[in-house]
Amino acid sequence: MPSFDIVSEVDEVELRNAVENSRRELSSRFDFRGKDASIEYKDHVVTLTAEDDFQCKQLVDILRTQLSKRNVEPSTMDVDEKSVHSGKTFSLKVRFKQGIETDIAKKIVKMVKDSKIKVQSQIQGDTVRVTGKARDDLQAVMALVRQADLGQPFQFNNFRD
């Protein structure tokens, strides 16, 4: 029986490239000349540091535009609400969503069941496996999940026939 997995993951190479491009843009921007600002990436967390809270927000915008240029969905970003003030600098932590949380996975399973498409879906850790008899049914589920607005992008992999 044909099946596929619904996953939500960020390509780490593209993420690293976007951070490097953001650093380059930061060094060439006129409004950051002479300012103490930096962008650092470590363990799926990007730390944005600047002298002012407003500049931290600008760094988030720079990172968001570079992510979209590298085809990394900006909706995977989880930005801290308030910047942390330590000494003379402000810092923001940006985390990236990896995997599908259980409540979102349950929403996907419920959405697939409510659609009356003849497939079975089950939660397997941070992925959702969808199995059906016809390939067309699986493609209909893919279209359904793409159209749903669940707050994070999904990829489909491990397609077996």
UniProtKB/Swiss-Prot annotation:
Keywords, in A-Z order: Nucleotide-binding
One Gene Ontology term of the molecular function aspect: nucleotide binding
Keyword Membrane: no
Recorded family membership: Belongs to the YajQ family.
GO CC list: cytosol
Keyword Metal-binding: no
Function summary: Nucleotide-binding protein.
Name this polypeptide is given: Nucleotide-binding protein Shewmr4_3156
Record CDD domains: YajQ_like
